[in-house]
Amino acid sequence: MALINDNYLKLKAGYLFPEIGRRVRAFAEANPSAKVIRLGIGDVTRPLAPAVLKAFHAAVDDLGTTDNFAGYGPEQGYDWLINAIIEKSYKPLGVSLKTDEMFISDGSKCDCANILDIFALDNVVAIGDPVYPVYNDTNVMIGRTGEADDKGYYKGIVYMPCNEENHFIPSLPTEKVDIIYLCFPNNPTGTVASRAELKKWVDYANANDAVIFFDAAYEAFITDPEIPHSIYEIEGAKKCAIEFRSFSKTAGFTGVRCGLVVVPEEVMGTTSTGERYSFNKLWLRRTTTKFNGASYPVQRAAEAVYSDEGWKQTKEIIDYYMENARIIREGMKEAGLTVYGGVNAPYIWLKTPAGMTSWDFFDKLLTECNVVGTPGSGFGPSGEGYFRLSAFGHRENVIEAVERIKKNLK
């Protein structure tokens, strides 16, 4: 008799974005003439930068020649890509990394889930609320939690409320925790953390022998020079933090798939017998066993992002999305809504009007404005009464969506 993993049955509902897709499809089928504008899921719309596309094509051509053919590559990623990232993305921040401390993957969503393989189940995990659903759901799936209560909180996870009172930046937990998820710039709230705020977390982690999972998927969208792009800009972070980055939004790789994890050699854990052991070694062992590496053409395309031409073109695309964010942010303010984010992040986090629930506002925008956003409650109980809009649309659609919402709410 084949038994299932019963932990999956603890999940309260379907993953947020498929549920949004289901509702939108049902509306579109019932209203075939409606022009639905999607500002919900954070998928990109701009094409790859020309320099990146050129490198992609050249790498595919390599596979058609005997001399340049590439088969299995190193599971950790090619050194030429890792070194390009370190030189162009970390050294300018004053961060020194070794080649074997970085791992190339097929995306940070997978990494945020897979990293749990090397941590014991009895670790106490702390996550923000609202939060990117993957952090919560993957801990449920592997069996770290009990059942969810009526609010949706799972027994065994420490939830850190992020609200207007704390400017959507969680406070240090009052109890001791072992793993801390931080995401800045934040998804879904669009907020960022200062050096002083991050230093509090690093100090807490080092004092409590905890590990920070730092999701920096949106660091390329930071416009304020005072805001850190990496947790490793903070003194002491290389002893306690694992950082995740993604090419999905930075370079438009949502359909290409490439990400990276930094696991410094100094980040240590404790065995069941009390000995200290490097998480870097564990992650390398896990990677070489369960992953064959990102594809050669994808890594060549990623490398091209860091060329002078590639980065200039990539930055232009990022600027395009951030102009969309400005348009949405200002438009929602003109509509009389309370708005957060959209300055150092491609997400706008707004309060729903007149005390509406998040899903009621979703249905209102869908049926009355034909605009799709993301209900804040889908990111956790503290997201109730909020709503996320994404800046990753086409400019003309963003402008039209904003005008529709303004007209409807005024």
Swiss-Prot record:
Residues that, per the record, bind pyridoxal 5'-phosphate: Y72, S108, K109, Y132, N187, Y218, S246, F247, S248, R257, N292
Protein family (similarity comment): Belongs to the class-I pyridoxal-phosphate-dependent aminotransferase family. LL-diaminopimelate aminotransferase subfamily.
UniProt pathway annotation: Amino-acid biosynthesis; L-lysine biosynthesis via DAP pathway; LL-2,6-diaminopimelate from (S)-tetrahydrodipicolinate (aminotransferase route): step 1/1
Residues engaged in binding substrate: Y15, G42, K109, Y132, N187, N292, R388
Summary of subunit composition and partner proteins: Homodimer.
InterPro entries: Aminotransferase_I/II_large, DapL/ALD1, PyrdxlP-dep_Trfase, PyrdxlP-dep_Trfase_major, PyrdxlP-dep_Trfase_small
Keywords associated with the record: Aminotransferase, Pyridoxal phosphate, Transferase
Modified residues (N6-(pyridoxal phosphate)lysine): K249
EC number(s) from the headed UniProt entry: 2.6.1.83
UniProt cross-references to SUPFAM superfamilies, sorted A to Z: PLP-dependent transferases
One Pfam family hit: Aminotran_1_2
Reactions catalysed according to its record: (2S,6S)-2,6-diaminopimelate + 2-oxoglutarate = (S)-2,3,4,5-tetrahydrodipicolinate + L-glutamate + H2O + H(+)
Leader peptide range in chain numbering: none
Top-rank lineage group of the source organism: Bacteria
Organism: Geotalea uraniireducens (strain Rf4)
Name of the featured protein: LL-diaminopimelate aminotransferase
Keyword rRNA-binding among record annotations: no
Function: Involved in the synthesis of meso-diaminopimelate (m-DAP or DL-DAP), required for both lysine and peptidoglycan biosynthesis. Catalyzes the direct conversion of tetrahydrodipicolinate to LL-diaminopimelate.
GO molecular function: L,L-diaminopimelate aminotransferase activity; pyridoxal phosphate binding
